[in-house]
Structure formats: C-alpha cells, structure tokens
C-alpha cells in the first residue's frame, strides 16, 4: 500500500530500468546517481533486466534493493520465462512503493504500466534515448506499447529534442518536464598534474603522448569508426596521439555492432598504427580515463543528453562533439566550453583535434570552462531535486 503516514519523510519509488550496476546503461547510471543523492528523502528500489546470470537475483547496492530478471536475448524460451518472472517481480516490488518511475522505452513498459494502474500507483516516465524513446518509434511497437507510452501521469525528458517530439504527439495539455542528466562532480573532477601522471601510468599510457578518448558502446549511431578515420587524418608530427576506446564491443547489448571493433583493429594493423589504438572494455571506474586523457570526442549521429560528454566536461577535458540539435548544442557553446562539428564529417573532427592538440593552453582553458558549465547546470544535485519535485507533483495529484 502507498504510505499513509503523514510523518513519513521518505517517498518510496520503484525505478524500472533496462540495466543497473554493475551492468552499464545511461539510464541505470543516472538512476544510481540520483538514488544516492536523494538518500534520506526518497527510498528507491530497482527492477531491472540483466544479461549476466552470475549476478544475484536480489541484492542491496548503496542501500538500494535491486531486483534482477535475467534474460538470454538469443533464446525465445528464455524471453518467455523472463517475461513471467518480470511480471511477478514488478507486482511484488510495486506493492511497496508510492511512485513507479519507468526509464526509457522497452517491453517492460506495458506490464509495468498495467500493474501501476491496477495498484493505483502514479506513474512517471523518463525519456532517455533519441530515436528509441520517441513517439514514431513506439508506434511501431504496437497499440498497447503506444498507449502505455502516452499514459504516464508525468513525463520527464533529458533533452529538449525528446521533449518537443513527445509534446508534438501528446498535445499541449500533457506536462513534460525537462530534467537533464546530472553528474557527480566530486567523482568526475580534474586531476592535478601529479595525480594525472599516476593515472596514466596505471592505465599503461606513456607520460607525454597525447591521448584522444572515446567512451561508449560500439554501435553504428556512436560512430567509433568515423573517429578512427578522423584520427588517421591528423597531420604527421613527432608524436602520434594515442586513440583509446572505452566501451562494449561484443554481444550482450542489442545496440552493439560487433563488426565495428574488428574493422578498426584490422585497419589499424594494416596501416601500421595498431600500437596506438587501444580498446578497453566497459568499466565502472571510467573517470580514471577521463581524468588522464587529453581530448574527448563524441562522434555520434544520434544522442539525447550524452552522459559521456558531461563526464568528460566535468573532468575538465576539452571535448569535441557532433552538432545534434536539441542535444549536444544544448550543452556546448561552440568555441567556448567545447567544439561542435557537423555529423559524419571526419575532416571537421580531424581539424578540431589538430587545433586542440596543438594549442594546449587554449585546450586547457576550454576544459576549465567546460567544468564550470557542468557545475552550473548539470551537477547531480540539480537533477535529483527535479526528480524529487516530479514525485511530489504526481503524489499531490493523486
């Protein structure tokens, strides 16, 4: 039952997301950070799917109870069993919450929405992913999915572009709150020179060779291969910058194209630069890479409100991103706290890289301004307050 004690100080919220720590997804990372920031005011629990059968079905992480339903995407019977377990898990967890908060669009949305309505729980939906969390894409999933998508009591959007697309479909009466992703600016912070040197050595990087960093899944939308081609365009110099990729390259996540990393490795070997191209699998200590690198590049063709870009900026790392209306251009002011380049323009990326690598003073100043932007607009405390306001809004309505 929902809490009826007026003296109760904590709102009980069930977060429903596609992946959660130690597995990695942008929504899951954001859920964990906000749950930590709201500790003492909001009692969060999590229902999530997992592709790792070694993880516990239920465990407590950072004081948050996490319920997992394991799914083998390659086996139809596994999907059927997982669906049944998910409904059971959702029913048990939702009975003990005041608000149900769905993150993103997936097959979990329909049963979650039905159960929330049956139990009389207000429903919040956050739009996280460009393309996937948009009305046109959800319509293709069928009438039930679209009805669930449009029926949330309150919709939150991480980016202006996602908010506008939802509003176009729902009409002006539907409230859609802009709630940008937030960053733990204590965890993601610049490293002093001595600490940075220690970090580089711990990662196996040379002390002085410049490092260009990519962080993200190896999906076609992320364009890791475009960055490789741009990196190869850099003019010859006494020291070739190292290109470091941090992100999942293999099966397990539906977004990943396994051929991308293979092609990059093959092309790097063929041109004799394989030693300067490094692949690191996903890590829950990604801040070590941001704090040790020289330049970050986000070459994506599609993003909503990219966490990796915010994390890089919070670490004072000069960053280059493709100009995506209502997404990256809502974060970066070109030439001030980062660089924006056209989508799919490897020459433009190479040119921006050349400038930042050549003028380290200007790059450093850009990194300082980038951190100031994150501190002012995207600290996790600001996101947490917006989520809390959303919970109070739907509870007051109900």
Model-derived features with residue positions:
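Conserved acidic donor-binding segment of nucleotide-sugar-dependent glycosyltransferases
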Residues: 333-335, 339-346, 355-361
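Aromatic "clamp/platform" in nucleotide-sugar-dependent glycosyltransferases that forms part
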Residues: 282, 301
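A short, histidine- and acid-enriched strand-loop-helix "catalytic/donor-clamping" loop
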Residues: 20-24, 74, 107, 123-139, ...
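Conserved donor-binding/catalytic core segment of Leloir-type glycosyltransferases
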Residues: 14, 206-222, 228-231, 243-246
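Carbohydrate-associated surface elements
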Residues: 50, 161, 182
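A short, well-ordered alpha-helix in the C-terminal region of glycosyltransferases
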Residues: 355, 362-377, 383-389
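Short hydrophobic beta-strand element within catalytic cores of glycosyltransferases
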Residues: 318-322, 332
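An aromatic- and histidine-rich active-site surface loop
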Residues: 54, 83-85, 99-119, 125-127
